[in-house]
Amino acid sequence: MAEHCQHQQYHIMTNTNHSEDHYFYLWRHRYIDDITDAVITRTCFGITSNLDKRQNGYEGHVGHGIKWSGTWSGPERQIRELEHRLKSAFRDYLFSGHNDAVYEWVDETIAFEDIRNWVQWEVENTFADIVKI
């Protein structure tokens, strides 16, 4: 019996189930505006349980390779809360497109560095279980 309990304890300690981790990401995207030909830089943010699959999705939409500008990992609940806080803090600066749909893109009036620094501060001061990767 003791051997069985030791085996169960070992399984719990070594199988932390990383599949439950979720990811918060930032992506700095530059594009050329079709109307003005100006180069616009916006910051995209979001959450996913699979960074590779999410990256493939973006690449399929934009037609070129992308590189995350920042990624963090942690429990789903905390990752969702981090995203919610960013949406609330930058609510007035989220890009709104066709039919006034609001997207997880912070408009070009906010510098990427300001968004990244905001996320880093939140992670360091609010979310003990989220780590930068």
Question: Could you tell me what each predicted segment is?
Answer:
Residues A2-I133:
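Non-catalytic accessory segments flanking enzymatic or RNA/DNA-binding domains
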